[in-house]
Design a protein with these regions (language model features):
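Terminal accessory carbohydrate-recognition/targeting modules of carbohydrate-active enzymes
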Residues: 23-243
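Bacterial Sec-dependent N-terminal signal peptides
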Residues: 1-25, 141
């Protein structure tokens, strides 16, 4: 009797395993987009846009960041798209379409490392932070191995394709990433350009205050960046989870 029960259990178990195996074969295999990177996570040549927001102040203002350097401001009735272009060796390159882009996120900071054969062996690094007390953000560009090439960074800010966003994500209604994109023919396009210093630190800063994009003296912009980084670092180190 016991042997009969054991045989029955074995047969049922084998059938169930077969069913699970067949079911698993029919499931679409998914590849992880992001991978652990220190206390953050990163991806290489990702395609997700406006999926990681940076918050600073207590207002609803936020900066949406992407797997590549294209950004958007979320501010009720005042949304903006922000993108950058590098001009080097007589050519212009949209930073969101370079050949190699590693994007990393850690505790309120988004970082990018970019390379492109068209501009030689140069490496362009970018990090962006939200301001802690005001509605805005700051970008820090750093250039390496560009030699004596003149590097110009151009920032562009304009309205987003959609002006009024849905606020019902909790019930499944939300706007797709294309809502944050720039329209084909922007009506409120503003362009700001800066030249990468060839003496001293090859760094260049941009800032957006509310919806105004600007650049300025590196010494002043650097202080704003460092203050935002200090605030972020202090906040991040106040609570640490180890798994």
């Amino acid at each position: 009797m016991k042997q009969t029960k054991l045989k029955t259990i074995a047969v049922v178990s084998a059938c169930m395993m077969g069913m699970l195996s067949s079911s698993a074969q029919g499931v679409m295999q998914r590849t992880a987009n992001y991978h652990p990177d220190g206390r953050g996570f990163s991806c290489v040549n990702g395609n997700n846009r406006y999926t990681r927001a940076l918050y600073g102040s207590v207002d609803e203002w936020r900066l949406e960041t992407s797997d590549r350097p294209i950004f958007a401001i979320f501010k009720k009735n005042n949304h903006r798209n922000i993108r950058f272009v590098i001009k080097c060796n007589g050519q212009a390159f949209q930073l969101d379409s370079v050949e190699y882009c590693k994007a990393r996120y850690e505790a309120g900071k988004r970082e990018y490392l970019m390379k492109d054969k068209r501009w030689g062996s140069g490496v362009l690094k970018l990090s962006v932070l939200a301001y802690p007390q005001t509605e805005g953000a700051v970008w820090k560009f750093a250039a390496e191995n560009f030699g004596k090439a003149k590097i110009e960074i151009v920032g562009m800010i304009c309205e987003t394709r959609v002006s009024k966003f849905k606020r019902a994500g909790d019930i499944g209604k939300f706007d797709g990433p294309e809502a944050f994109d720039a329209p084909a023919q922007p009506k409120m396009l503003s362009t700001v350009a800066g030249i990468m210093p060839q003496k001293g630190a090859a760094e260049l800063y941009f800032s957006v205050d509310n919806t105004v994009l600007s650049t300025g003296k590196n010494s002043e912009m650097c202080k704003r960046y460092q203050a935002a980084e200090q605030w972020r670092s202090d906040l991040a180190s106040s609570v640490i989870f180890n798994t």
